[in-house]
Amino acid sequence: MDAASGAPLLTQPERLERRLKEIPAEPGCYLMRDCDDRILYVGKSKALRSRVRSYFRSRHDLSPRIRLMTRQVCEIEFIVTDSEAEALVLESNLIKNHQPHFNVLLKDDKKYPYLCITWSEAYPRIFITRRRRFRSPLDRFYGPYVDVGLLRRTLFLVKRVFPLRQRPRPMYPDRTCLNYSIGRCPGVCQEKISSVDYHRTLRKVAMVFQGRSDELQHLLQEQMERYAERMDYESAARVRDQLQGLDQLTADQKMSLPDSSVSRDVLALAFDERLAAVQLFQMRAGKLVGRLGYTADASGLEPGLILQRVIEEHYSQVDSVEVPPELLVQHALPQQKLMEDWLTEQRERRVQIHCPQRQQKADLIELVQRNAEFELLRAKQGQEKQSLATEDLAQLLELPTPPRRIEGYDISHIQGSDAVASQVVFIDGLPAKQHYRKYKIRSSSIRAGHSDDFMAMAEIMRRRFRRWARAKAEGMDVGALRHKGGSALQTDGLNDWPDVVMIDGGKGQLSAVMEALRELDLHEDLNVCSLAKQREEVFLPGESQPLESEPDQLGVVLLRRLRDEAHRFAVSFHRQQRGERMKRSRLSDIPGVGPKRVKDLLAHFHSIDAIQLASIETLSKAPGVGPALARDIHDFFHPSDEGTDADARAALEEQPQELSA
């Protein structure tokens, strides 16, 4: 039965029992969907029927998070696999693809940065990114790195030690730039170095980010000696300079262990009845090269299971080169052999998991545990501070209970062009980025030269709450949510009712929002306020004067954080949209390239920089591009010296940097 046409299974005991009987007692994965056919949760088991039945048999043993989830389940799907190991891999892929809301065990709000090398390109780029989007199976992400400042410094030094491509696009179409003249770039833009030799240089760079600096130094030392034996002193001096630069790079690493040949990851945690803080130390060739921290819901979970979930989460997100040959864990894992087999498959070489009890390895576990205890204390103090802020906000807005889910909205445009809006969500006083939403303003009245923030904000409110308006029209008691707390009555597939809606603006924006909510018949059901920038004043609907408040009181500070985050998110989306429009309009200037061909070119090459660097032969292989058009595109970006168009050259230099970097 289609989930979208049904009701929650808990309200239909007979249908629930029939559905549970249909599930086989085989290994595999299960997917729980709500009444809007959205995936709520993905899980795995070696016996699907008993595992899924456990969610509905003794619900008092479930955590509050899972109890809330089961109330929304309208359909259960399953995928049978040959083994539990296959189920683990499938579960990881399904979670990565669908990102179900209730699979968020790890509540770490950081998105750690990675270093990306685009090995699929003839002259690979190397850059820092927080988005792991594989454009090719050959591209590699190294990390994640907890200290983005150290990562930036390392990349800066690497580009000084090794001659690397310094720019995402050429500065000049027909000659090299200053970086080539001073030896910092090998002249990639004019193909002064072959693709094979450039890849060889980048393989050395990759060793730095794999924690193999000692091995690289040994290789460079041998290379320098070979050059010296052949009396190629210029090349030997260049390698000597690289060795000296590597010494500066390795000086940044925090600590070393006596066994300098071992690479391993070490996991330990500290926890109380509600919260767990997990630390993962990355040791490469005996040196600590990275440290990652996670917080998790610990209610009703054994410490070994928490560590296992962290392992599943972390290693499903990294490349095989980032999986070490050994993991040390503080507590035995419930499925340790399964985890070893899965990691071995990920790494394509044997991986062992140990729970050490004595000597040096146990000392290392103790060190990581001490760090976890500090992180647990810090997390609890942060929770207490956020709790005080939500209590103060409840008092300020005269709410019956502290708000759990708070939403903030903002508009961004330049005189009406590329108008967008943002929706950011704070849960328990902290950003919940998985719930953020971006909107493109659709109103034809808002365009370049014609802006209307009031109309834009009203449009977003209609689009955000129209499902709730439908539910109210069909008989749902939406008004009860205002007084009992949104999370208490989230049913029928609707689980995103906010306890507070905050608008960035003053009385004008607030009035426009309330008029839109009045059209939806929700104006009396939502708690709405606005925050004016100039004096940090809080306004409520129907009130001509702002609330009596201080800019530095905890509740107002929470609203300011929400407002600033909504503004940041809206501006970043606006810049992205404007950049994409500029790219499209730039390509549209080429004769014979219309809107559809622009779309096809960007889909094939992924960025305007790649189109600009492509040869005529490469361009001609793109869908819908023949030899003649390929030459026109190439000539547009590489005009001849005799007929250089100054305006085209100036426009070329004004192209936006690619967004993924």
Curated annotation (Swiss-Prot):
For this protein, what is any one GO molecular function term?
excinuclease ABC activity
Of the GO CC terms on this record, one is: excinuclease repair complex
Question: Where is the stretch described as Disordered?
Answer: 636-661
Which stretches make up the GIY-YIG domain? Answer: 25-104
UniProt-listed InterPro entries: GIY-YIG_endonuc (IPR000305), GIY-YIG_endonuc_sf (IPR035901), GIY-YIG_UvrC_Cho (IPR047296), Hlx-hairpin-Hlx_DNA-bd_motif (IPR003583), RuvA_2-like (IPR010994), UVR_dom (IPR001943), UVR_dom_sf (IPR036876), UvrABC_protein_C (IPR050066)
BP GO annotations: nucleotide-excision repair; SOS response
- Compartment(s) where it occurs, according to its Swiss-Prot or TrEMBL record: Cytoplasm
Keywords from the UniProt entry: Cytoplasm, DNA damage, DNA excision, DNA repair, Excision nuclease, SOS response
Name the PROSITE patterns on file: GIY_YIG, UVR, UVRC
Record's keyword annotation contains DNA damage: yes
Q: Where is the composition biased (Basic and acidic residues)?
A: 636-652
Limits of the UVR domain: 214-249
Q: How does it assemble?
A: Interacts with UvrB in an incision complex.
Tell me its family: Belongs to the UvrC family.
Q: What does the function comment of this entry state? A: The UvrABC repair system catalyzes the recognition and processing of DNA lesions. UvrC both incises the 5' and 3' sides of the lesion. The N-terminal half is responsible for the 3' incision and the C-terminal half is responsible for the 5' incision.
Protein name according to UniProt = UvrABC system protein C
